[in-house]
Amino acid sequence: MNLVSLESFLDNTAFLVLLLTMFAYWVAVVFPKPWLVQGASGAMAIANLTITALLGARWLEAGYFPISNLYESLFFLAWGITAVHFIAERMSQSRFVGAVTSPIALGIVAFAALTLPVDMQQSAPLVPALKSNWLMMHVSVMMVSYATLMVGSLLAIAFLFVTRGQAVELRGSSVGTGGFRQGLVKGNNLNPVGNLNPALEGVSGNSGNVAVLEKTTSTPAITLSPQRLTLADTLDNISYRIIGLGFPLLTIGIIAGAVWANEAWGSYWSWDPKETWALITWLVFAAYLHARITKGWQGRKPAILAASGFTVVWICYLGVNLLGKGLHSYGWFL
């Protein structure tokens, strides 16, 4: 079997394994049997190894890191998602992570293996602009950051689904253990009630007498079952942590790209569509992390912001290339 035939076998195998993985996780959500969850996790590991073997075979065939066209980048993205999946699953110990990540990985592999024309699946010599060591350093880091941010955003979307898009009061902290919530800390005073429930607050003057009564208002939170509340709390926390992992990767990838651009084109930043949307992506997730860390946001509001980030990542990765304009248009995906 030559390498081309092996690659064809491996991409079809990856599709079939991910299809089984998705169904296994979905069944495990309904019937939470330990052996079923372990089987689904094992199938995801097989899918990741299959994609790894595919990328390795392509590397041997082409002689360069396999991330030079849409087909290769899609499989690299799927590899990144399946790899980040295990980080999220280990952190959460929840079968719901796989129920969210397996469909997107399956969709990406299906698009690459079954939808792309044959000529777009074949390897080709690198264009001169890509013959650089920066290809691996910049593009691979960007793709891993996309995969990580997608997984974090998907978990945020799952949170919105579990909570039906309503405001819920979570028990965890937006910044992990030792964090604070919005409304609990103001200056040096602790307010155990905060703005969780309507209450009457006394405002004292200098004489010590109560001067006025003010009624504080808040949006009432819906009540979830203990199981759904625990799941929502887990999804919110893990989504935040995964996005916190992907954001520095995105930052490093953008900086590496700027250095490469200066070497190749004599300018660190050219404001072409890909660079502009990479900056927009960075700003969206910077706003997300800023809101969670400094404002104490939890639950619905940051989840909506992360969900919008999922769309922005796809536009940055794939959407702007449909324009066929800019310095990145030669790779159709870069």
UniProtKB/Swiss-Prot annotation:
InterPro entries (alphabetical): Cyt_c_assembly, Cyt_c_biogenesis_CcsA, Cyt_c_biogenesis_CcsA/CcmC
Keywords linked to the UniProt accession: Cytochrome c-type biogenesis, Membrane, Thylakoid, Transmembrane, Transmembrane helix
Upregulation: By light.
Compartment(s) where it occurs, according to its Swiss-Prot or TrEMBL record: Cellular thylakoid membrane
Transmembrane segments: 12-32, 35-55, 67-87, 96-116, 141-161, 242-262, 277-297, 303-323
Effect of inactivating the gene: Cannot be insertionally inactivated suggesting it has an essential function.
Coiled-coil segments on the chain, per record: none
Superkingdom field: Bacteria
Chief location: membrane
One Gene Ontology molecular-function label: heme binding
GO cellular component, one term: plasma membrane-derived thylakoid membrane
Stated family: Belongs to the CcmF/CycK/Ccl1/NrfE/CcsA family.
Its biological purpose: Required during biogenesis of c-type cytochromes (cytochrome c6 and cytochrome f) at the step of heme attachment.
Subunit text: May interact with ccs1.
Protein name: Cytochrome c biogenesis protein CcsA
Lineage: Bacteria, Bacillati, Cyanobacteriota, Cyanophyceae, Synechococcales
